């Protein structure tokens, strides 16, 4: 009889684990697919789209001078976009990456505490607006988060299993994730602190050291190449307390209000959750803190580079909620149920951090002996997460609007298709905004790219090589109207770019042309310039010369 009872308890526990892991993944899958086609890509997504559609030799050639840090992702997207080159397909890997991360966060909660903690943690991760944002981004960050969550789960298995093969699985997963984005290397510091808090034996440290060595060996060539391309992150600024505050708000299920403070309180309560706190707290705090600290010397910080650290927040909040539910169950013991989702050994969720104990069949068979608040507590937690999601619905709707991204190249292209006449010349200022025409070539099929000398795929560059300043000036002398797709900030400020060809573009349109039509989409402005009358052009040229001389003296 005892054997049959244990068998039934084990089967119920397995079913509870499956439910806890599957439900959050399905939830974020639905959220991610909702409004996935926004009707236009923004700049970074267009880079993914264009590079992914090149041949493998062309991608390899490009990576020698640009975006080596994203090389593995571009090769992956080359395979994906071969199925169908479209905006929805471009973003689908991120949707599935977010779903995988939610399931893996739930699996961590199940492994470290019990199924309902995993269910709550996975759901909290799924409904956090930041998760939904990057689930709909045609970039690598959602996949990176999935890789880090998988590596963290493999770390626990390696610690508990004590086999050499498990450490190679852990090191391999983390190495591949580092190739998706090199900032993942900071996870090694978080995992090292986790092992220290768990007080693991020397053999575990040796296994982890070998795995970390594998990660370093794989990552070193990428770091060396990316150092040569460090100018790509020259736009980043030194982060301050305001960026840290924004990150805290983004890592919680709601950025402000009652839900925010309740979530923070539960996370604080979760700090006493034993093994889970030893895993979640270093993951949540250490990578962002290290990157912000390094960025005080050399700016490298951006929120998306540490998106993977978000997984620690729902784990702590779910563990805190579990401890609160257990306390309520002790006050009203008659409400304690027998749902496997709510069962678990109290020593797993409430003990101080200590040595990791193997997680096996015996824990499942004896779990029903622990204190539980049962199905009612589990469903109450699920309902609370659902209410938090409802409160965040305005944020989700806003995030799915085309105007919420830095720009909408699709909208700019639609305006170009409507307004450009056959044979009209077009300038891109700076040249990287040629991405607009390359991403939506049909919209610019009537236009003449007056500055382009050699295409991007042929030259091994992203947006091609442009003609010389003198040749461009001669070409522009023969046109009476020219369209400009330019960076809004450059056009507003009038500051001369560093590149000579870019300076000629700006100088000629300011001296010899007048802006007539204007369409702005975030960072991108689409303008029509028509040639000034002769007398006006002479006055404008004189004024421009004086202005340029003044700038040179200053």
Stretches with model-predicted labels:
Residues 536, 541-550:
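Serine-biased, low-complexity intrinsically disordered segments, primarily in secretory-pathway proteins
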Residues 68, 82, 143, 179, ...:
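Intrinsically disordered, low-complexity regions enriched for glutamine and histidine
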Residues 2-6, 13-329, 377-534:
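Membrane-proximal helix-loop-helix interfaces that form the catalytic/acceptor-binding platform
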């Amino acid at each position: 009889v005892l054997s049959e009872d244990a068998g039934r308890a084990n089967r119920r526990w397995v079913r509870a684990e499956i439910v806890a892991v599957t439900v959050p993944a399905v939830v974020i899958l639905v959220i991610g697919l909702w409004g996935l086609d926004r009707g236009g890509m923004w700049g970074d997504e267009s880079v993914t789209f264009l590079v992914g559609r090149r041949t493998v030799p062309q991608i390899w050639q490009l990576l020698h001078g640009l975006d080596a840090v994203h090389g593995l992702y571009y090769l992956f997207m080359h395979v994906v976009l071969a199925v169908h080159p479209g905006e929805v397909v471009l973003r689908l890997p991120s949707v599935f990456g977010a779903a995988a991360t939610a399931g893996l966060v739930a699996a961590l909660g199940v492994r470290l505490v019990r199924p309902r903690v995993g269910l709550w943690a996975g759901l909290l991760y799924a409904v956090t607006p930041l998760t939904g944002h990057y689930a709909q981004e045609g970039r690598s960050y959602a996949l990176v988060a999935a890789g880090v969550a998988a590596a963290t789960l493999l770390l626990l298995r390696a610690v508990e299993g004590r086999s050499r093969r498990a450490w190679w699985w852990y090191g391999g997963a983390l190495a591949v994730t580092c190739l998706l984005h090199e900032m993942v290397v900071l996870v090694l510091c978080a995992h090292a602190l986790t092992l220290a808090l768990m007080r693991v034996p020397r053999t575990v440290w040796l296994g982890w050291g070998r795995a970390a060595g594998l990660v370093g060996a794989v990552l070193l060539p990428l770091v060396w190449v990316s150092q040569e391309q460090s100018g790509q992150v020259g736009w980043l600024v030194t982060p301050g307390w305001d960026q840290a505050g924004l990150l805290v708000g983004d890592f919680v299920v709601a950025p402000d209000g009652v839900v925010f403070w309740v979530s923070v309180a539960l996370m604080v309560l979760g700090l006493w959750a034993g093994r889970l706190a030893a895993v979640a707290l270093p993951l949540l705090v250490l990578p962002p803190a290290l990157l912000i600290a390094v960025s005080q010397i050399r700016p490298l910080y951006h929120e998306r580079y540490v998106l993977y650290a978000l997984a620690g927040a729902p784990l702590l909040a779910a563990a805190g909620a579990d401890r609160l539910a257990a306390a309520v169950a002790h006050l009203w013991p008659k409400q304690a149920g027998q749902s496997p989702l709510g069962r678990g050994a109290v020593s797993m969720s409430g003990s101080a951090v200590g040595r990791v104990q193997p997680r096996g069949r015996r824990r499942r068979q004896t779990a029903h002996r622990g204190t539980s608040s049962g199905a009612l507590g589990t469903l109450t937690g699920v309902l609370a997460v659902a209410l938090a999601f409802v409160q965040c619905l305005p944020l989700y709707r806003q995030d799915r609007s085309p105007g919420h991204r830095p720009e909408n190249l699709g909208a700019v292209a639609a305006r170009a298709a409507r307004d450009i006449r056959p044979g009209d010349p077009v300038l891109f200022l700076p040249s990287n905004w040629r991405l607009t025409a390359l991403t939506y070539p049909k919209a610019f099929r009537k236009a003449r790219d007056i500055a382009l000398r050699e295409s991007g795929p042929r030259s091994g560059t992203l947006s091609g090589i442009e003609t010389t300043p003198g040749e461009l000036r001669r070409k522009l002398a023969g046109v009476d109207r020219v369209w400009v797709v330019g960076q809004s900030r450059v056009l507003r400020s009038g500051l001369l770019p560093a590149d000579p060809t870019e300076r000629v573009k700006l100088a000629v349109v300011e001296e010899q042309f007048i802006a007539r039509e204007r369409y702005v989409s975030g960072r991108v402005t689409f303008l029509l310039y028509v040639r000034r009358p002769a007398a006006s052009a002479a006055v404008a040229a004189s004024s421009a010369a004086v202005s340029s001389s003044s700038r040179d003296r200053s």
